[in-house]
Structure formats: structure tokens, C-alpha cells
């Protein structure tokens, strides 16, 4: 067994030979097992590339990525992947799609799990995939992924085509399955609000590099949102991620190096405040609170 779901060391992926063709560069992080991880970043940040590498669909250009203690290719039977475009066979019915999932995952398939997820959306098992809405296709894709009882579930923008009610219901199903079976989940999104209430770990990607990595509570605790009168002294020696002055008021997100001096009002930032401040300032130093390299416990 391993206590690490994903571990990247100097990981990079380049497409083509152009100078600016790097989708990911010098990425290092560790994701422990049993976490629900938000993979966040703007469009084009490298989120989909990182998930494709973890799913074994792309080889890295440089560095190393281990999945569940082994290579992505060897870990593939233990990994579920829901791609952004939900690639399903349009000519198959819902029932035939689940039968295909059973045939592709001998010894691992949990038919009752897959059927329960499909039934939760009131889908007709005889309906052909090509007749389904985007949200219904998402539910079928999730049924396929969870039906194989994965140890690691990777999802690329899984809720993008769902209405708010369907998103809430499907997220509840997903969290219940994760809690019951201890599945590690990585969900990508560029909308932090979708993930804030469900995730306990964060990977923030910007410009193809890891900007923040670690437990969300630890990352929030390492920062302070401070406000005070413009011109107030006392931030020297602290890492200022972002500062803004509006009229006579200065607001900043900092990483304190010790006690604050001066007349500052300080609070722990929300996840959204933390993420947005780092994305608005690409020059802010990266922070990883979980060790990039950890001892693996062999079975």
C-alpha cells in the first residue's frame, strides 16, 4: 500500500518544439491518499494536461510522476478518469455502456454502484447516449468511472455542463462514494466556488507551474488578509502576495513571517481570496505545505 496518490518531481510537458510550447514546467507536489483535491487555475493553465499525465494518456517530457506508488500506465486499472468532453459511444444505450464498463474492468466492476448513479438521474437504460443532455452524459461518465471502484478518481471540469441543482446532487453522490470507500478525488475547475465546500486539498496551477499545493486549511492559515489606512507601516519582512489601495484604505494578502506591527486588522482569507490573489500576481513565491517527497509504505 502507499500513502501517496500523486507525486510529481520536476514534472514538465511540452507540445511541439516551439519555445513557448510548455504546458507544464518544473512541477513538484505530493497528494496524500484519501483527499478530495481541487485542481484550480485559469483556462490554459495546464490543468487538463496534468490530469492526462496522471491518467497515463500522455507521457511527460521531463521529470517524474508516480500514481498510487507506481507509473501512470501500471496504475491505470486503479484509476478512474472523467474527461472534460465525456467521450462515450453515441450509438450505445445507457445499459450497453454500463455492460461495456463491466467488460473492460473484470474483477473490479461494481454494477450496483454504476446503476445507482445512473438511476439517480432518472435515466432510461434503453436511451442511446447520443440522445442524452450534457448533464446526463456527465452522470453516465461518472457511473463508468466509479463503477470500476477506483482508488483515484480524476475529473476534468466535471460539473461544467450541469445546472445548479444537478451539480449539487451529483456532488453529494460523489462525496458519499468517496467517504464510503476512501477514494482519492482530484477535480479540476476554474470556478473556486464549485469546490470550496467539498475539497480539503488544493493544487493551484498558473502559467504551467504549481503555485500552491497542500491542505486547504494549512494554506489559508499560512496567509493573512490585512487592512489598514494607506501608508500604514509594518509589512516589511512579510511576503506580500498582493496589495491594493482604494482611497485611504490599503488591503493586502500576506504570508506573515512573524507578528504584525502597526495598526492592521487581520483575518484568515477565504479559499477564493487566496486563489485570486496568487493568480493576480504571478510573481508571488509558490508555497507547498505538504512535502514534495514522502516515504512510500510498501505492502
Where are the regions a protein language model picked out?
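ABC transporter nucleotide-binding domain
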Residues: 168-254
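Catalytic Walker B motif of ABC-type/P-loop ATPase nucleotide-binding domains
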Residues: 153-157, 162
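ABC-family P-loop ATPase nucleotide-binding domains
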Residues: 85-140
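Conserved structural motif at the start of ABC-family nucleotide-binding domains
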Residues: 6, 24-26
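Helix-to-loop junction immediately C-terminal to a conserved catalytic motif
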Residues: 55
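The feature captures the beta-strand-to-loop junction immediately N-terminal to the Walker
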Residues: 40-42
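Conserved ABC transporter NBD signature motif
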Residues: 62-75
Amino acid at each position: 500500500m502507499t500513502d501517496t496518490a500523486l507525486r510529481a518531481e520536476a514534472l514538465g510537458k511540452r507540445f511541439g518544439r516551439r519555445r513557448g510550447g510548455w504546458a507544464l514546467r518544473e512541477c513538484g507536489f505530493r497528494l496524500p491518499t484519501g483527499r478530495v483535491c481541487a485542481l484550480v487555475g485559469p483556462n490554459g493553465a495546464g490543468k487538463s494536461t496534468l490530469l492526462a499525465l496522471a491518467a497515463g494518456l500522455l507521457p511527460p517530457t521531463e521529470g517524474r510522476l508516480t500514481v498510487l506508488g507506481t507509473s501512470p500506465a501500471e496504475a491505470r486499472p486503479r484509476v478512474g478518469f472523467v474527461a472534460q468532453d465525456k467521450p462515450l459511444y453515441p450509438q450505445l444505450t445507457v445499459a450497453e455502456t454500463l455492460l461495456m464498463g463491466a467488460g473492460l474492468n473484470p474483477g473490479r466492476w461494481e454494477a450496483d454502484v454504476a446503476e445507482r448513479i445512473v438511476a439517480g438521474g432518472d435515466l432510461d437504460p434503453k436511451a442511446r447516449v447520443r440522445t442524452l443532455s450534457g448533464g446526463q452524459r456527465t452522470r453516465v461518465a461518472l457511473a463508468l468511472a466509479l463503477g470500476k471502484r477506483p482508488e483515484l478518481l480524476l475529473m476534468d471540469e466535471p460539473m461544467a455542463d450541469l445546472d445548479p441543482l444537478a451539480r449539487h446532487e451529483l456532488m453529494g453522490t460523489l462525496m458519499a462514494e468517496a467517504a464510503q470507500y476512501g477514494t482519492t478525488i482530484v477535480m479540476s475547475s476554474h470556478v473556486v466556488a464549485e469546490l470550496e465546500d467539498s475539497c480539503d486539498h488544493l493544487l493551484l496551477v498558473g502559467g504551467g507551474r504549481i503555485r500552491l499545493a497542500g491542505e486547504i486549511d494549512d494554506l489559508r492559515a499560512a496567509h493573512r488578509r490585512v487592512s489598514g489606512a494607506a501608508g500604514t507601516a509594518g509589512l516589511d519582512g512579510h511576503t506580500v502576495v498582493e496589495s491594493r489601495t482604494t482611497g485611504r484604505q490599503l488591503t493586502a494578502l500576506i504570508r506573515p513571517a512573524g507578528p504584525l506591527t502597526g495598526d492592521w486588522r487581520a483575518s484568515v482569507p477565504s479559499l477564493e481570496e487566496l486563489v485570486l490573489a496568487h493568480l493576480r500576481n504571478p510573481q508571488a513565491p509558490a508555497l507547498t505545505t505538504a512535502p514534495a517527497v514522502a516515504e512510500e509504505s510498501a505492502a
